[in-house]
Amino acid sequence: MPLDYLPAQHPQRAQLHNEIHARPPEALAAPVAIAHIVMWADAAQREASRAHLAALLRDQHQAMPDAHSTHLRANLGGFRLRWELHTEFVTWTFSVPLPADAWNQRAPAAATEAVPREWLSQLPGLCLCQLQLWVLPTREYDELPQLGELLREDSLVASSVAQGHGEVFTDFCVHADGSSRMVLLAGSMAPRRLGRLVQRLLEIETYRMAALLGLPAAREASSVLAFAERELAE
């Protein structure tokens, strides 16, 4: 159909419209361990993260990203990597499939244990968020006493998600390993739906922390404004 009846188009319309499809959620199968790290970075550190990514890919004999890549997904032996370059931060997400009996004896290892330790310790920028997430194909919390090894019961909170098809647990604590933690009981949730849910949880944690960066300045400004109000009242 000819489009000559349409008004003049913005030159970036198609690019902006397609941005929603640039980083789609990945289908996931439970059980799986996921680590999500957000590094707050300036322009130089964001470029350094690209070089840091290239070093990992080179060590794993993988193709290098091009100079303009802003996101990448790759299978790297024992783990899968998802890297995303944002305006003010860089996210690194690692996922490791777990065996079906991973919770039979004790809580499973974190996904970061599959990542080269020295390389991980040198991520460019400042760590704003480090979340460890375990996804399990069950809905029975009472059958998982090992959760006590991961989450503090005195601050444990839970919420029903995905219209009641799953439950997520967290304790809103930063643990000794520097990570916050979540456990998602996903039951028999379909892989694509599970992938969308996990991406939402990771984004909630990312932007919760990013939004709170302004809190110290807001508190400081609040005391200044309170003093100014008293001055005006006098």
Feature names for model-found ranges:
Residues M1-C129, W134:
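N-terminal pre-transmembrane cytosolic regions of membrane proteins
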Residues E84, S95-E234:
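Extended alpha-helical interaction modules
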